[in-house]
């Protein structure tokens, strides 16, 4: 509505209003109005001074060239302004669409979003970590027991296992070695890391 009132006011004031405008507010029509004003002034000069008509015509060509450049600049800036407005409108529509879709895709209060590119992201569940810690504690206990047994063997409190092997051979007793049982049974740590390595490849 305001633009229509501005156009009516501009028509009432004539083309001279274009010269008073801010250069960044000029339109192509304003450039045509300026061209009309300059052309009228050049005509007046050429009519009054008959001897300077060749100078006026040279000046007229230069002014026409400047006005053509001004027109090109105004066209380019108005296109840029329109492109920016279109881009703004597109972005507004995109934001509105995302806001509408946002609650559907939103994360609940007991959920967490994980950035897969973050090197410090959590990789295991709490239960897996608990299992690993329990396994580690069991292995520590076994290590302490083995170190104690080794210390006992070294000090001579427990007879060496070579003596026990000889007596077992004499009795011809067949037993399954504990190492075979251990190899059949994968530890939680090994299975966890083998699962993780399988995922990465």
Swiss-Prot record:
Record's function text? Involved in cell shape and neuronal morphogenesis, positively regulating the establishment and maintenance of dendritic spines. Plays a role in cellular protein transport.
Record's keyword annotation contains Coiled coil:
yes
Query: To which protein family does this belong?
Result: Belongs to the RILPL family.
Q: Which GO terms describe its biological process?
A: epithelial cell morphogenesis; protein transport from ciliary membrane to plasma membrane
Identify one Pfam family in the record.
Answer: RILP
Question: Any S-S bridges, and between which cysteines?
Answer: none
Q: Which UniProt keywords apply?
A: Cell projection, Cilium, Coiled coil, Cytoplasm, Cytoskeleton, Protein transport, Transport
- Domain named RH2: which ranges? 121-197
Protein's recorded name = RILP-like protein 2
Signal peptide location in the record?
Answer: none
Q: Where is this region: Disordered?
A: 177-201
Location of the RH1 domain = 14-108
GO MF terms held by the record:
protein dimerization activity
What spans are recorded as compositionally biased (Basic and acidic residues)? 179-188
Question: For this UniProt entry, what's an example GO CC term?
Answer: cilium
Q: Where in the cell is it found?
A: Cytoplasm, Cytosol; Cytoplasm, Cytoskeleton, Microtubule organizing center, Centrosome; Cell projection, Cilium
Q: Coiled-coil stretches, from where to where? A: 67-155
